Amino acid sequence: MKSLIFVLLLGAVFAEEDKIVGGYECTKHSQAHQVSLNSGYHFCGGSLVSKDWVVSAAHCYKSVLRVRLGEHHIRVNEGTEQYISSSSVIRHPNYSSYNINNDIMLIKLTKPATLNQYVHAVALPTECAADATMCTVSGWGNTMSSVADGDKLQCLSLPILSHADCANSYPGMITQSMFCAGYLEGGKDSCQGDSGGPVVCNGVLQGVVSWGYGCAERDHPGVYAKVCVLSGWVRDTMANY
């Protein structure tokens, strides 16, 4: 199982053509917190949480990267984009590459983002979302479709699953810093290239796209870093760094 997860994560880092599965094109700039992490190509997503900081997944770590904000069509300059380099990239101190626990990192920008209708921050949680809450995951990851235009930001509505359903899907692998969201019957999921991107529930960042067994497979929903559990570290780091 570990090797399968490792392959998925490698795909998340290196696959340029990877998109959301079973979703739809987001309304343009409706996910204005969504960013693309770029090192000459899109390799992961992220979320703007203040004018100076982006949240992403720790497994997306690169010591230097460029953050692209205000994107919709990732291969077309639409005049709404902002490109800002990282000044610091900080993984959670207890991140484990073995079991992908505490899969969260912060990126400090070299200059503040200009907040406008195309670029704005998403709120951090003050409490965890309840089971069955409907959320939106977005990204430029693998659509596994010949129809969907994955160069345009894709969205997917999906419910938070119970801890029991999540643990049953991945026995012995789910920690308190993870949750599952999606459909046990399969067919809809985040996928490679979506890693690090947002799961937003009622306007609040509750999840970071982390890992899973394949994409959109039956009884194997997507697994996400649980931001409500990790938000203390996020807030402390932003305040003190």
UniProtKB/Swiss-Prot annotation:
Residues 20-239 form the Peptidase S1 domain. The keyword DNA-binding does not apply. The active site is at residues 59, 103, 195. GO terms for molecular function: serine-type endopeptidase activity. Pfam families: Trypsin (PF00089). Its EC number is 3.4.21.4. It catalyses: Preferential cleavage: Arg-|-Xaa, Lys-|-Xaa. The record marks 189 as: Required for specificity. InterPro entries: Peptidase_S1_PA, Peptidase_S1_PA_chymotrypsin, Peptidase_S1A, Serine_Proteases_S1, Trypsin_dom, TRYPSIN_HIS, TRYPSIN_SER. Transmembrane segments: none annotated. SUPFAM superfamilies: Trypsin-like serine proteases. Residues 1-13 form the signal peptide. Disulfide bonds join 26-155, 44-60, 128-228, 135-201, 166-180, 191-215. Its main location: secreted. Residues 14-19 form a propeptide. It is found in: Secreted, Extracellular space. GO terms for cellular component: extracellular space. GO terms for biological process: digestion; proteolysis. PANTHER family: TRYPSIN-RELATED, TRYPSINOGEN 1A-RELATED. Belongs to the peptidase S1 family. This is Trypsin-1.
